[in-house]
Amino acid sequence: PFDLVLLDRDGTLNVRVEGGYVTRPDELVLLPGAARAVADLSGVGAPVVLVTNQRGIARGLMDRGDLVEVHARLAELLAPAGGRIDAVAVCPHDRDACTCRKPLDGLFREVLGRAPWADPRRSVMIGDMPTDLEPATRLGMRAESVGPQSPIDRVVARLLAADRACDGPSDVRRGEGHVP
């Protein structure tokens, strides 16, 4: 089993707005299979953490309240399939304005710092861009790429099947501290 599951948002769970940002809940459209994939990941017992760059905040296109509403809508869309997001780590900064914006690893280090029981080698990051995966790889996490030819539901099914085959019976850690 995994200690942590990290997910990118735009292009991984929801349709990416080309040249723009998801700034309102009604603009959030899940990709096919995303709700089922998150439900399957939620079922392994590891916290599921959204790790997302949201430069639209720095650009004044939205504020943190808008982002909270978008993420509340995401939770509503995932819930019927049994999926959940346990925590959200956001970089609201513009490029070159911080150390947390992917492909830097500040957000990943923050998540790991709040989950001291989690071993990066037993954690996975799923994203659609190389910039999503680079920090995970640097920190020793497994990195899985999704996209039109590798939709998230297929990637997750393969990932979980491989994990079950390697580990045998699971010893899922429940309640040993979730990322706040």
Located regions from the model:
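Conserved protein kinase catalytic core
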Residues: 14-16, 59, 134
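Short, well-ordered beta-to-alpha junction loops that form the rim of enzyme active sites
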Residues: 10, 53-54, 128
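Active-site neighborhood of HAD-like aspartate-dependent phosphohydrolases
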Residues: 1-49
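Substrate-recognition element of Asp-dependent hydrolases with the DxDx(T/V) motif
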Residues: 34, 38-71, 86-96, 136
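Asp-based, Mg2+/Mn2+-dependent phosphohydrolase catalytic module
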Residues: 1-3, 64-87, 95-125, 129-180
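Active-site loop/turn elements of alpha/beta-hydrolase fold enzymes
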Residues: 18, 53-54, 148
